[in-house]
Regions:
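Beta-propeller domains
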Residues: 1-482
């Protein structure tokens, strides 16, 4: 970890850079008339709602007692089309409460950053802040009896109440010494969460953070890197934490030009994947070279009997390359299986499915172990945020080498779906998949529950939400009794 003097110097420099970036961001305003992430299906919601009389088609499984939560960017006030990036918009969480076979409510609430509190005319939310921004907009999950909204690159987690209200910006009771991540992964054997965290103000190191089942940080290990890589996600196996050090890195030029998301494709950055023993040191990391690409999301990983490590990922050919600066863009996103050889320090890549896809999820009771099924959202080649056409979900049988498709039909756009196992499950796919599906024609949204073992069949239940929920980022099921 950095010394107090280094931390103070970095904070001063960060404030100075932020001031220059803010000035140039104001100069961008008015230079662009439109932004696909501020209009059409992405047009932000303008109010917080609580709806209790929800129309249900089908039957909600009575075993489901908890909240489905999903978060995403949703500006709380006017946003400049020229200066807005989807990854940095104000966070809004959407939730549906299920109990006893009923949908008790839908709610949406902004995450109270300082900017959101000002826009809503409210006092600032309590709790300390970290990094250039306190916007939190990328993931939401339950851990240690609390609900947490998460972001990467410096911001602290935000603790939410049962009705999704912001309680506090909370570095896990003061035990977290730097920023966190949007993607911690829970070890199903120990209940610990593992995370690889990076800071926008620290270009030469990332951190391995371990969170106890009680919600307190028990380990923070600094790991040297170069160029400030954007590490959105990681993965765990029985013995390792997998680090994705890939060629999207911090760009001072982009920051100083006023663009709020200062990460760009860097062809000069060495692409590599690290195997960190869970209790090891930075010197113990085994770095394996991989052909240049970018991965937002691995699905799962595990170790083989011969000492190799399997990692299944959605691999973008490039990311944040070229002229598009409003959000993610790549031409190809196949689902791949990577085999990491810690002896040869190499990665071999095999395409499981060449069709574009994202948001891969397994049955997370199998996290870090050999598994059979993976679920993902179709992402057509050349995806256009202004005219999205991703109507399908995929189910991969990795043992049989087959794929099933659930197509919601033209004008019905699913996001990430999460697998929830049946309490009495014996088979890996005995459970439900759940997520939001936007109905473009009717400016509405359905919360859909699919039977995972009847993937191509009709939904088990569909709950109508009578407004359009803008496409978001990540969601999770938070059971009332974990």
């Amino acid at each position: 970890m950095s010394s107090p003097i280094e931390t103070a110097i970095r904070a001063t420099v960060t404030r100075g850079l932020g001031a220059v970036a803010g000035f140039n961001r104001s100069r961008l305003a008015g230079r662009k008339a439109s932004n696909p992430y501020l209009e059409g299906v992405h047009k932000p919601m303008e109010a917080e709602l609580t709806l209790e009389a929800l129309e249900v088609t089908g039957s909600i499984p009575p075993e489901l007692d908890g909240r489905y939560l999903r978060i995403g960017p949703n500006p709380a006030g006017p946003a400049s089309p020229a200066a807005y990036h989807w990854f940095t918009g104000d966070g809004m969480v959407h939730g549906v409460r299920l109990k006893d076979g009923k949908a008790l409510w839908y709610r949406n609430r902004w995450i109270r950053s300082k900017a959101v509190s000002r826009a809503l005319g409210e006092p600032e939310a309590p709790g300390p802040r970290n990094g250039l921004s306190d916007t939190v907009n990328t993931n939401v999950l339950g851990h240690a009896g609390a609900l947490w909204a998460l972001v990467e690159a410096g911001g602290y987690p935000v603790r939410l109440g049962e009705d999704l209200q912001t309680l506090a910006h909370d570095p896990f009771g003061g035990t977290l010494k730097g920023g966190f991540t949007a993607h911690p992964h829970q070890d199903p054997e120990t209940g610990e969460m593992h995370a690889i965290c990076y800071e926008g103000s620290e270009l030469n190191a990332v951190r391995h953070v371990v969170l106890s089942p009680e919600g307190r940080v028990t380990r923070e290990l600094s790991i040297p890197v170069r160029n400030g890589p954007s590490i959105h996600d990681c993965m765990i196996t029985r013995n390792y934490v997998i680090i994705l050090d890939l060629p999207v890195t911090f760009s001072l030029k982009t920051l100083l030009s006023g663009h709020p998301f200062p990460y760009r494709w860097n062809p000069d950055h060495r692409a590599r994947v690290g195997l960190l023993p869970k209790t090891g040191t930075a010197d113990d990391v085994i770095w394996c070279d991989v052909a240049p690409c970018y991965v937002f999301h691995p699905c799962n990983g595990y170790e083989t009997a011969d000492g190799k490590v399997i990692l299944d990922v959605c691999a973008h050919d490039t990311m944040f390359d070229g002229d598009r600066v409003e959000g993610p863009a790549s031409e190809s996103t196949p689902f791949e299986r990577w085999t990491l050889d810690p002896v040869a320090r190499s990665v071999s890549r095999r395409v499981i499915d060449p069709d574009g896809q994202e948001f891969p999820r397994p049955n997370e009771t199998r996290l870090g172990k050999p598994y059979r099924y993976a679920y993902a959202m179709c992402l057509p080649a050349g995806f256009d945020a202004a005219a999205p056409d991703q109507t399908r979900l995929f189910k991969h049988d990795l043992e049989a080498g087959t794929r099933q498709v659930h197509d919601f039909g033209m004008g019905h756009l699913p996001g990430e779906f999460v697998f929830v196992p049946r309490p009495t499950a014996r088979a890996e796919d005995d459970g439900w998949l759940m997520g939001y599906v936007v109905d473009l024609a009717n400016e509405a949204t359905d919360f859909v529950i699919l039977n995972a073992d009847d993937f191509e069949g009709p939904p088990q239940a569909s709950i109508r939400i009578p407004h359009r929920i803008p496409p978001g980022v990540h969601g999770n099921w938070a059971p009332s009794e974990p």
